Swiss-Prot record:
It comes from Neurospora crassa (strain ATCC 24698 / 74-OR23-1A / CBS 708.71 / DSM 1257 / FGSC 987). Component of the ER-mitochondria encounter structure (ERMES) or MDM complex, composed of mmm-1, mdm10, mdm12 and mdm34. Associates with the mitochondrial outer membrane sorting assembly machinery SAM(core) complex. The keyword Transport does not apply. The keyword Membrane applies. The gene is mdm10. One of its GO terms (biological process) is mitochondrion-endoplasmic reticulum membrane tethering. Residues 256-270 have a biased composition (Low complexity). Belongs to the MDM10 family. This is Mitochondrial distribution and morphology protein 10. The lineage of its organism: Eukaryota, Fungi, Dikarya, Ascomycota, Pezizomycotina.
Length: 480
């Protein structure tokens, strides 16, 4: 389960138009969330609130042997008015879904909308005006062409927003903070810090400089822990990356190219469009280099990913391959959205030096049933009336035929109640499971009860059937 502050931070990225998917460290994000999802330990309660469009708070209390907790505060310079903050209104897929579909790449002059209209995300479609997303302060930017590709960085500075976040852990008195500052449409800087007595020099600071041009993304980092210097990069090609001027809110060339062909080429156009829809996706290749200035050691890795795009009409899938040539590790993952309610993922690790290998599989299964009904196979609690059959055409009566006339008009039927329809957020919960080569299993059920979002899970070791349960926990969140 994503924490409320992570949900708000993602909303900040969406409001400012920053694409978190276009980074090298997010290459394996889909399979990682489907397989390595965290399991709750003990009992943990979280109370959160988006008090104003600019300010959010969160209080957490947990018990794992000892009672601990944390206090969090977040401030955003841009009003976050386009999201649902109440726990009874937050779309569950936006908070719990693990399969992450890539967002469309935007050209340098276009406004980004990360909270897209993907039906699988559970999020509302992008607003029709910049006022609905950026507030009244963006009217001048709209007049200057913010949505038409004009240069508005100097006009109003809508891309120069910032986010401040702080969290205090009790009773350890550990303090962490984060500052996100957007300088231009393509440049963003993050500074993260942790202060704790047990750490070297009493704490550590991590600085990130991120540069995103859509077709490629670069990232430089420095950490005071070991004097680590690093550089990461990701380059995209194929799909929407092949055209830097592709408008994400207009049909892709593979969908409507037949409208520009003459009648003699309709068949060829349909075949080409169908072929493009069948394999329409984006390739990404990248790598990272890092060096520790204190311990005089370094490392590197290379990676590649293919993922289908939202315009793809077939089965959404993501495949990745990463290699660490110095350590000899090869990692391959494959994830797909088998159905709208079912996602599957698998991962294989192999070391060319030791010949050791590991594998793991994971899945998430969404349901519109309560937990008990889901496990017992009961019918869903939402009863949807079947669609009425179309009325049959009534023949003329015998009397009307004898008198060579039409039947008298029938009285208007009484209005019938509108049948129930499925809501956008029809799911009541999701079951997540994973299994690795050591026969360690993780089970997690996440859902909503009234205004509470809960997560209950356990870790099971099948090698120790006498004491199989390794962990058990319950986490409850409430936000207003």
């Amino acid at each position: 389960m994503r924490e409320f502050m992570n949900y708000i931070t993602n909303a900040f990225y969406g409001a400012t138009g920053w694409n978190e998917d276009n980074k090298y460290n997010e290459l394996n994000a889909t399979s990682r969330e489907l397989i390595d999802f965290p399991l709750p330990r003990g009992l943990r309660l979280t109370l959160s609130s988006l008090a104003t469009p600019h300010f959010a708070t969160s209080y957490q209390l947990g018990s794992v042997g000892v009672v601990d907790g944390s206090i969090s505060y977040l401030h955003s310079s841009i009003p976050l008015t386009h999201i649902a903050a109440q726990s009874d209104k937050i779309p569950l897929p936006a908070l719990l879904r693990c399969y992450r579909r890539l967002h469309d790449l935007r050209s340098p002059g276009q406004q980004h909308y990360i909270l897209d209209a993907d039906p699988l995300s559970g999020l509302p479609p992008p607003p029709q005006s910049a006022r609905a997303l950026l507030g009244a302060a963006s009217d001048a930017a709209v007049a200057g062409g913010a949505l038409d590709g004009g240069n508005t960085d100097q006009d109003l500075g809508i891309y120069t927003h910032s986010l401040l976040y702080g969290r205090l852990y009790l009773p350890k008195s550990l303090l962490e903070g984060m500052i996100i500052k957007r300088f231009t449409q393509a440049l963003q800087v993050q500074v993260r810090a942790v202060s704790e007595q047990s750490l070297r020099n009493g704490g550590t600071i991590l600085g990130l400089v991120q540069y995103d041009k859509g077709k490629y993304g670069l990232e430089g980092l420095y950490s005071t822990d070991g004097g680590l210097l690093g550089f990461r990069g990701l380059y995209n090609f194929g799909g929407d990356a092949s055209s830097s001027t592709c408008d994400p809110w207009t049909p892709t060339p593979g969908e409507n190219n037949n409208n520009n062909n003459n009648n003699n080429n309709n068949n060829n156009g349909n075949a080409q469009a169908g072929e493009k829809e069948r394999i329409y996706g984006r390739f990404s290749v990248g790598g990272e280099l890092y060096y520790g200035t204190l311990n005089k050691s370094g490392g590197m890795s290379l990676g590649a990913r293919f993922a289908t795009l939202p315009a793809h009409r077939g089965t959404p899938l993501t495949a990745t391959l990463t290699i660490n040539p110095l350590m000899g590790n090869i990692n391959a993952t494959y994830a797909l959205l088998a159905r709208e309610y079912c996602s599957l993922a698998t991962r294989v690790d192999f070391n060319v030096y030791s010949y050791e290998s590991e594998w793991a599989v994971g899945m998430e299964l969404w349901s519109n049933r309560r937990p008990a009904g889901f496990l017992l196979g009961a019918s869903p609690s939402n009863d949807f009336e079947p669609e009425p059959h179309p009325p049959r055409k009534k023949e003329r009566s015998f009397q009307a035929k004898m008198e060579w006339r039409l039947d008298d008009p029938e009285p208007e039927p009484e209005p019938q109640p509108t049948p129930k329809t499925r809501k956008n957020d029809e799911y009541k919960g999701v079951l997540k499971a994973r299994l690795d080569n050591n026969l360690r299993m993780g089970l997690l059920w996440e859902g909503r009860a009234k205004s509470l979002i809960f997560s209950i899970g356990t870790g099971i070791d099948l090698h120790k059937l006498g004491e199989p349960f390794r962990s058990l926990g319950l986490e409850v969140q409430y936000s207003s």
